[in-house]
Amino acid sequence: MRKLTYYIATTLDGFIAGPDGSDPTGPNGFWPIPEDYIQHLVSEYPETLPVHARQALSVTAEGTHFDTVLEGRRSYEIGLAAGLTDAYPHLRHLVFSRTLTESPNPSVELVADDPVSTVRELKQQAGKDIWLLGGAELAGSLYAEIDTLILKVGPLTIGDGIPLFSHKAVFDPRTWTLQDHTVLKSGAVFLTYARASS
């Protein structure tokens, strides 16, 4: 069965974006992207690079982890604001929204249904694992369905912002088993956790 992986960049203090929710790596962002970080993404997670980054870096690798990406409307709108109607044309791309009524790109599937039932259906289908891109609200809604966490921890703190999970996650303590870790010279750490068995 396919797994749902929340693969996300986070600060040391657990935030995925600043208080306004804008792209922390964008033109006015606060998140530095060192060369070794980019090299690690290219070699280990090429499918998670958006199309403009893949083109700029001449990345053609299919990737071995994911063939489907899920994101909420607010995360999707960050790409739209940058002129990307489908930042991941190399993946099946689902956007969860109750307010968007028409997809700006025929390759992007809009889903107004319950995210939990949709993910349970996706897990039963053949294919590679499912990448939960974010944001925090969708991650909060899917908290109980997440099988793997891959945290790209940047060596910075911001004090306030959007946390890994929104208030939509219920209080439900879970333990996770460290499966892998990579420490980059720039100070970023990639941590892979699997949900511990009950």
Identify what each model region corresponds to:
Residues 1-198:
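Enzymes that bind and transform nitrogen-containing heteroaromatic metabolites
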